[in-house]
């Protein structure tokens, strides 16, 4: 079974990279021997890098796949000690942030006996009983159990919670200067500033498995950049997240939220305008939902030229604001899951997040 998965990946990758049949057969022969001797096999650095890029390209829920080949891959399979691990995490955050000019990065640790990360994302806000991000209550309780104490605000950056092999679970507070955040304001509605809203610059997913040719990498944090609606529609407005619709509408001086007033819709549009322009004002990369949809159209054309079928999950590719203005909305997608890919960990069954845009 493992060899068949390895064979499918190697043949696919090596043909895309224009390797001769003789080289492909030699590599497959070596892998088959290694599996017979050890029960597994080890990817070359080139295979790891290209496999990670293919995983992004195959991510059905991601609208930002046009840039799959620009992914920066850090091979951290040799990282085993705590100092090196924390240094590699800080390095990833710094390089991905890039002073606001965000770059897509993935750091891949060993498939076995590597460090374990308990956070859903490397950077997220704590969730308390009466404030913060309700989606992070479980991680916040774990952090508190380990001795971490937040300030009790809506936007306390959670520490990194991790475990090295044969060691206890620990937490690590990031240097304040490492985490770039964007205060949210609206140039036409100054009252919005009084809500003291902000959001972190880089979404770095850390609760998914990366699978390449049958080998699972359980710790492989990765990032792209935000699509504006992920913050302005989902994170701030969903009633199981920050649930800010009424407060935002009040800041915009909308006197009613009756359904037939259309003020709920207006509030969403104005808040997304505020998020987008706040990020741009701070020099932080972000994409609006209509541009992202156009980029996905280009991705589809590029893939068609290469003779590859684009798979996708329609409900994720149609943005949550004005979806009918995008081509994604108007046709279906084959949701077949290809390998390599990113997979939700089984214990995280409620973690419905897009790999590169959440």
Curated annotation (Swiss-Prot):
Organism: Staphylococcus aureus (strain MRSA252)
Keywords: Heme, Iron, Metal-binding, Oxidoreductase
Protein name: Nitric oxide synthase oxygenase
Superkingdom of the source species: Bacteria
InterPro entries cross-referenced by the UniProt entry: Nitric_oxide_synthase_Oase-su (IPR017142), NOS (IPR050607), NOS_dom_1 (IPR044943), NOS_dom_2 (IPR044940), NOS_dom_3 (IPR044944), NOS_N (IPR004030), NOS_N_sf (IPR036119)
Assembly behavior: Homodimer.
Disulfide bridge partners, by residue number: none
Job of this protein: Catalyzes the production of nitric oxide.
Gene encoding the protein: nos
